[in-house]
């Protein structure tokens, strides 16, 4: 259990460092750009909550947060219509240049998040820790390719 707590602490730090831009102000964002920024910010909040809940092993609450993340991941590409890049959006043009790749990245995120849900349902902390890490990794992986 001590090893899992160390891993969990590391994951929380990684998740917090992965998406710092989400919390920055996006002055002037409106419409679908603001909606997607709000969804990304909510996702970070859900990830932080899951990390805290893992310590208390509140599996039901973990599932609720993970379901919210997955719901966003499933619809994320819909929030990136052509022409919705540019300031104040932090989205790279690569999203629209390789939209199939972007959709695949969103699906990878949804699949990783489903892993959190399944591990929490099984009350398997080892699998949950791995799924949490995988989900955080999908965030950073996508940001490296598709976010400014």
Over which residues does each language-model region extend?
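Bacterial N-terminal signal peptides that target proteins for export
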Residues: 1-9
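C-terminal segment of classical bacterial N-terminal signal peptides
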Residues: 15-23
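Extracytoplasmic c-type cytochrome modules immediately beyond a signal peptide or single-pass transmembrane anchor
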Residues: 26-134
């Amino acid at each position: 259990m001590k090893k899992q707590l160390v891993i969990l602490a590391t994951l929380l730090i990684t998740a917090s460092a992965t998406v710092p831009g989400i919390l920055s102000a996006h002055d002037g964002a409106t419409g679908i750009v603001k909606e997607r920024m709000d969804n990304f910010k909510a996702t970070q909040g859900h990830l932080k909550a899951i990390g805290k809940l893992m310590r208390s092993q509140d599996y039901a609450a973990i599932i609720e947060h993970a379901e919210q993340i997955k719901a966003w991941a499933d619809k994320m590409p819909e929030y990136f219509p052509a022409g919705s890049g540019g300031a104040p959006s932090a989205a790279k043009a690569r999203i629209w240049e390789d939209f199939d790749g972007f959709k695949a990245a969103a699906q990878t995120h949804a699949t990783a998040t489903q892993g959190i849900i399944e591990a929490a349902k099984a009350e398997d902390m080892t699998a949950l820790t791995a799924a949490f890490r995988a989900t955080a990794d999908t965030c950073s992986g996508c940001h490296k390719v598709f976010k400014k």
